[in-house]
């Protein structure tokens, strides 16, 4: 019995070490990318914001965990979720309030009163307010002692309102180009870009919200996507977008610092305050930099998570109406839960989704370089 327990402990230790190794590899990969970018592009300034935000984010998050435990800010696990998730019950949540502001503050300090600083301010507005919507949702969830805080309609209404204000600010300052670049073609859609912009912010923030279901999944994917966006911006227009690229990498660093404590087994969850803000920042940056196509490619995992839910609900409703009994295509959605119920290890799923995201980022960058 002692021998079997020792063997089990050794397996757990080996597994824990492999998770740490993956995160160190990710940190090293992004750091090298930043250094190379700063060397290659004269206007690039990625290394310093990335290192600063990673360090500060990890320190602030580490300090914040005991504070959350003290005031009993703990995750509520939904009853219909995978059974192994009940082991996560009581893990502190609302981590977004610690790491999201770090990326914003560092960006504002580095580029205060510089050219295009109004872009940083405008994006800071939408990110902070989406974080605040998430905070309200997290708070109400804890108050009700349920996994749901705001209703779907309430959340969509608040997101739509903030998105509309953001779009109006962008329109009055000509921050969003009225054309969309897809592959090598440019489509001028005029004022249609504004309703599209609202849709992008809603779709992206809800996709990131759905993706945040496994330890380190969203934070790790976000590090890669933010970095990919930064490099994409520099490739397309290194001289005019030197403000947006460091903002991307500052957000990547903030997510990276959080990931050190969000890795399996997570010591802290980001909550809706983190996931909604990440989605808003990705969507907002992609809109202003005209990289919606790049975001769609690099955020393939985010899109897949969201689409899996839409397909599942649609098939269930249609089959129930036609046959009188609802049928499911997936064991459970979002998509990561389907793979969980298939018997796959949580960290294996997370690492695989990171790898797919890395592959999609590389594909996008190759495409941009060749075009």
Curated annotation (Swiss-Prot):
This is Phospho-N-acetylmuramoyl-pentapeptide-transferase. Its EC number is 2.7.8.13. It is a multi-pass membrane protein. NCBIfam families: mraY. Coiled coil: none annotated. Its cofactor is Mg(2+). Belongs to the glycosyltransferase 4 family. MraY subfamily. PROSITE patterns: MRAY_1, MRAY_2. Pathway: Cell wall biogenesis; peptidoglycan biosynthesis. Catalyzes the initial step of the lipid cycle reactions in the biosynthesis of the cell wall peptidoglycan: transfers peptidoglycan precursor phospho-MurNAc-pentapeptide from UDP-MurNAc-pentapeptide onto the lipid carrier undecaprenyl phosphate, yielding undecaprenyl-pyrophosphoryl-MurNAc-pentapeptide, known as lipid I. The lineage of its organism: Bacteria, Bacillati, Cyanobacteriota, Cyanophyceae, Synechococcales. It is found in: Cell inner membrane. The chain crosses the membrane at residues 21-41, 46-66, 92-112, 119-139, 156-176, 182-202, 216-236, 241-261, 268-288, 296-316, 349-369. GO terms for molecular function: metal ion binding; phospho-N-acetylmuramoyl-pentapeptide-transferase activity; UDP-N-acetylmuramoyl-L-alanyl-D-glutamyl-meso-2,6-diaminopimelyl-D-alanyl-D-alanine:undecaprenyl-phosphate transferase activity. The keyword Ligase does not apply. One of its GO terms (cellular component) is plasma membrane. GO terms for biological process: cell division; cell wall organization; peptidoglycan biosynthetic process; regulation of cell shape. Keywords: Cell cycle, Cell division, Cell inner membrane, Cell membrane, Cell shape, Cell wall biogenesis/degradation, Magnesium, Membrane, Metal-binding, Peptidoglycan synthesis, Transferase, Transmembrane, Transmembrane helix. CDD domains: GT_MraY (cd06852). It catalyses: UDP-N-acetyl-alpha-D-muramoyl-L-alanyl-gamma-D-glutamyl-meso-2,6-diaminopimeloyl-D-alanyl-D-alanine + di-trans,octa-cis-undecaprenyl phosphate = di-trans,octa-cis-undecaprenyl diphospho-N-acetyl-alpha-D-muramoyl-L-alanyl-D-glutamyl-meso-2,6-diaminopimeloyl-D-alanyl-D-alanine + UMP. The gene is mraY. InterPro entries: Glycosyl_transferase_4, PNAcMuramoyl-5peptid_Trfase, PNAcMuramoyl-5peptid_Trfase_CS.
């Amino acid at each position: 019995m002692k021998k079997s327990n020792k063997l089990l402990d050794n397996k757990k230790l080996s597994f824990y070490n492999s998770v740490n190794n993956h995160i160190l590899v990710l940190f090293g990969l992004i750091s090298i990318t930043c250094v190379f970018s700063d060397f290659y592009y004269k206007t690039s300034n990625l290394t310093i914001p990335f290192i600063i935000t990673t360090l500060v984010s990890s320190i602030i998050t580490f300090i914040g965990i005991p504070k959350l435990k003290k005031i009993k800010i703990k995750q509520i696990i939904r009853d219909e979720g995978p059974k192994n998730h009940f082991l996560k019950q009581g893990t502190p949540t609302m981590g977004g309030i610690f790491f999201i502001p770090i990326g914003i503050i560092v960006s504002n300090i580095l580029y205060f009163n510089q050219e295009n600083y109004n872009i940083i301010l405008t994006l800071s507005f939408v990110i902070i307010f989406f974080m605040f919507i998430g905070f309200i949702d997290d708070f109400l969830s804890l108050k009700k002692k349920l996994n749901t805080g705001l209703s779907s309609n309430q959340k969509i209404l608040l997101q739509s309102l903030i998105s509309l204000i953001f779009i109006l600010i962008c329109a009055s300052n000509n921050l969003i180009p009225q054309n969309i670049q897809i592959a090598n073609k440019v489509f001028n859609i005029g004022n249609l870009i504004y309703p599209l912009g609202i849709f992008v912010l809603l779709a992206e923030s809800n996709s990131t919200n759905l993706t945040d279901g496994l330890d380190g999944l969203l934070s790790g994917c976000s590090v890669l996507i933010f970095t990919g966006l930064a490099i994409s911006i520099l490739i397309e227009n290194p001289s005019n977008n030197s403000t947006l690229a460091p903002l991307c990498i500052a957000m990547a660093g903030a997510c990276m610092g959080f990931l050190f404590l969000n890795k399996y087994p997570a010591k802290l969850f980001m909550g809706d305050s983190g996931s909604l803000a990440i989605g808003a920042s990705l969507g907002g940056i992609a809109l202003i930099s005209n990289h919606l196509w790049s975001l769609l490619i690099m955020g393939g995992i985010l899109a897949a998570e969201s689409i899996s839910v839409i397909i599942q609900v649609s098939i269930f409703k249609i089959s129930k109406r036609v046959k009188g009994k609802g049928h499911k295509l997936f064991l459970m959605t979002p998509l990561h839960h389907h793979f969980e119920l298939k018997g796959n290890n949580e960290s294996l799923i997370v690492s695989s989704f990171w790898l797919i995201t890395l592959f999609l980022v590389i594909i996008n960058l190759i495409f941009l370089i060749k075009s």
